[in-house]
UniProtKB/Swiss-Prot annotation:
<keyword id="KW-0540">Nuclease</keyword>
<dbReference type="GO" id="GO:0019843">
    <property type="term" value="F:rRNA binding"/>
</dbReference>
<dbReference type="GO" id="GO:0004521">
    <property type="term" value="F:RNA endonuclease activity"/>
</dbReference>
<comment type="function">
    <text>Acts as a ribosome collision sensor. Detects stalled/collided disomes (pairs of ribosomes where the leading ribosome is stalled and a second ribosome has collided with it) and endonucleolytically cleaves mRNA at the 5' boundary of the stalled ribosome. Stalled/collided disomes form a new interface (primarily via the 30S subunits) that binds SmrB. Cleaved mRNA becomes available for tmRNA ligation, leading to ribosomal subunit dissociation and rescue of stalled ribosomes.</text>
</comment>
<protein>
    <recommendedName>
        <fullName>Ribosome rescue factor SmrB</fullName>
        <ecNumber>3.1.-.-</ecNumber>
    </recommendedName>
</protein>
<dbReference type="InterPro" id="IPR022990">
    <property type="entry name" value="SmrB-like"/>
</dbReference>
<dbReference type="GO" id="GO:0072344">
    <property type="term" value="P:rescue of stalled ribosome"/>
</dbReference>
<keyword id="KW-0378">Hydrolase</keyword>
<comment type="similarity">
    <text>Belongs to the SmrB family.</text>
</comment>
<dbReference type="Pfam" id="PF01713">
    <property type="entry name" value="Smr"/>
</dbReference>
<keyword id="KW-0699">rRNA-binding</keyword>
<keyword id="KW-0255">Endonuclease</keyword>
<dbReference type="InterPro" id="IPR036063">
    <property type="entry name" value="Smr_dom_sf"/>
</dbReference>
<comment type="subunit">
    <text>Associates with collided ribosomes, but not with correctly translating polysomes.</text>
</comment>
<dbReference type="InterPro" id="IPR002625">
    <property type="entry name" value="Smr_dom"/>
</dbReference>
<keyword id="KW-0694">RNA-binding</keyword>
<feature type="domain" description="Smr">
    <location>
        <begin position="98"/>
        <end position="173"/>
    </location>
</feature>
């Protein structure tokens, strides 16, 4: 890139004579150490811990009792069955989507935990989990895992526009579950 204000020889000589006898300044800028840890580190650690905590509830040993007839559905005891009906009709539209295609069971558990933690953190009431068809491993396991989590109020097979029988709509409790 060319300098648009280039100096001719006379101007350059004038500049050099005007600065003769001057000394170059020593760098006097001081860089202070940060008082606190970097802000970006703490939320990443907190998010990872939330994900681990949320996936703690998912067990392959425990088999909750789910209805085998009809579409995949579940409502937590004490929660309103009307919420399940609204899920089925498509009254709720999910704000967060999770695609489990191509994940292993362990990865799927971690992602489900992260989704539920994100729902709580972002105050999202409805989310969509797309487990797909595949070999039916995640299709069978996903409802079992979701039924074990205390933050899940209900879930139902998603309407066609959100994935049909290859996805679930999940209602998440935003406040802490009551221990009655």
């Amino acid at each position: 890139m060319s300098n648009k204000y280039s100096l001719n020889d006379d101007e350059l000589q004038l500049f050099r004579t005007s600065i003769t006898g001057t000394k170059k300044l020593r760098q006097d800028t001081y860089t202070h150490k940060p008082l606190r840890r970097k802000i970006g580190e703490l939320p990443a650690k907190r998010a990872l811990q939330e994900q681990v905590d949320a996936s703690f509830y998912f067990s392959d040993e425990f088999q909750p009792q789910l209805d085998a007839e009809g579409p995949t559905r579940y409502v937590r005891p004490g929660a309103s069955h009307y919420e399940l009906k609204k899920l089925r009709r498509g009254d709720y539209s999910p704000e967060l989507f999770l695609d489990l295609h191509g994940l292993t069971q362990l990865q799927a558990k971690q992602e489900l935990g992260a989704l539920l933690a994100a729902c709580r953190r972002e105050h999202v009431y409805c989310a969509c989990v797309m487990h797909g068809h595949g070999k039916h491993i995640l299709k069978q396991q996903t409802p079992l895992w979701l039924a074990q989590h205390p933050d899940v109020l209900a879930f139902h097979q998603a309407p066609k526009e959100f994935g049909g029988n290859a996805a679930l709509l999940v209602l998440v409790a935003l406040e802490a579950p009551s221990l009655e």
